[in-house]
Amino acid sequence: MNPKTYEALETMQKRVDQIDKDLQSEEIVSDVKKMLELNKERANLIEVVEKFIEYKTIIQSIADAKEILGNEKDAEMIELAKMELSENEDAVEPIVAIIEELLLPKDPNDDKNVIVEIRGAAGGDEANIFAGDLLRMYKLYAETQNWKITMLDANSSEAGGFSQVSFMVKGDRVYSKLKFESGAHRVQRVPKTEAKGRIQTSTATVAVLPEMSDVEIEIKNSDLRIDTYRSSGAGGQHVNTTDSAVRITHIPTGVVAASQDGRSQHDNKDIAMTMLRARIYEAELEKQQAEADATRKNAVGTGARSEKIRTYNYPQNRVTDHRVGLTLNKLDQVMEGKIDDFIIALVNDEQRQKVEAQLQDNE
């Protein structure tokens, strides 16, 4: 193990020991905020610290076995020491790999709920229909993960599907999996309205935004313009006669969020504010990412909405994720929410990129 890594792990272990002592003190027990902070810090450290303790135990066992082999005369004891030495030496590389993976920088948003926005893009009616197909796909996937979906806002298309639809997904580590869905999803198929059977290419864009609290994204009321208007259903039909729909504009950034599907103006304002915080955060994150990529001269994709990430070819029952070069000939299953193969490949690719970035930083 790298000496610097070993030193850093020793520091982490000492910090966990100190936190454990602090959590026993009356001063901390009576301070709920501080206690929560310490527990959160401990939770972030404990997994890698436990693996480090396991690693040190293995190294000590190797040293003990070597000492026995150097001093022992009994044949049976020598044989046992050889077996123990072999087993522990074989265990070193795997546990070091686990520790190195645990030390990779974590996305602070991985545990968050998300807001997903799907928009029909290039392709007119067919793009809107495909946006509806993607919504169904994500709903079915959410069911397999025991996640809860709440619709936030939707503009239905007369031909079917949606020109725009937004929904919240709540559950365990939602962002860690769905964040890879951000980008342009291209579909190739024969539209139902196509009499000559020609294949049309259309696009729907997906944005996956981590839900941000008002503490994480502070927005001044003086920076907001709030407009109210009448909610309308598909085709522009008014569904109520009061100005219950809400549109909020963040004046400094120009970011806009609107909601009309809540039960009241108050509900719609809350929904719009939730979406606004997420969009402001995303805009700032994209700005920082662009600066980081420029500094690194890194040409890899960023998952931006304009980037084509996946192609769904219906005639050939084929789906290709262009970021990892993975093609699955089971589009029918993918559209039923079975997208785990893509997500696992993308998680692994993210880990690989983090390792490469860390190696570059260490050079």
Swiss-Prot record:
SMART domains in alphabetical order: PCRF (SM00937)
SUPFAM superfamilies: Release factor
Modifications made to the protein after synthesis: Methylated by PrmC. Methylation increases the termination efficiency of RF1.
GO CC term, one of those recorded: cytoplasm
Modified residues (N5-methylglutamine): Q237
Transmembrane feature ranges: none
Disulphide linkage map: none
Location(s), subcellular: Cytoplasm
Family stated for the protein in its record: Belongs to the prokaryotic/mitochondrial release factor family.
Protein name in UniProt: Peptide chain release factor 1
Species of provenance: Mesoplasma florum (strain ATCC 33453 / NBRC 100688 / NCTC 11704 / L1)
Gene name as annotated: prfA
